[in-house]
Amino acid sequence: MSNTKHTTSHHMELKRIIILTLLFILIMLIFRNSVSFKMTFQELLPRFYKKNSNSVSNNNRPSSIFSENLVDFDDVNMVDKTRLFIFLFFSFIITIPFMV
């Protein structure tokens, strides 16, 4: 009977490790897609902030919403990374009691 409990316990630990691994893989995939989200955001945002003038010269220049002083997408990416690392750290801290 003790052998059966040991096998069941081992099976549950393995299942828990697999679930945690899949969770972290999912989080990393979401993080990787944030780059594609950023690119899509950069392409879509100027469409909403177009100026009303019909001048040809205004159509050729980039939208003012992307000036360096207004939006810095490198900083946004660093914020995403920081939030992700904080989330992963606390997720790991929370899951430690379940691993023991």
Swiss-Prot record:
Major subcellular site: endoplasmic reticulum
Spans through the membrane: 17-37, 78-98
Entry annotated with the keyword Transmembrane: yes
Compartment(s) where it occurs, according to its Swiss-Prot or TrEMBL record: Endoplasmic reticulum membrane
Domain of life: Eukaryota
UniProt entry keywords in alphabetical sequence: Endoplasmic reticulum, Membrane, Transmembrane, Transmembrane helix
Record membrane topology: Multi-pass membrane protein
GO cellular component: endoplasmic reticulum; endoplasmic reticulum membrane
Name the record gives this protein: Uncharacterized protein YNL146W
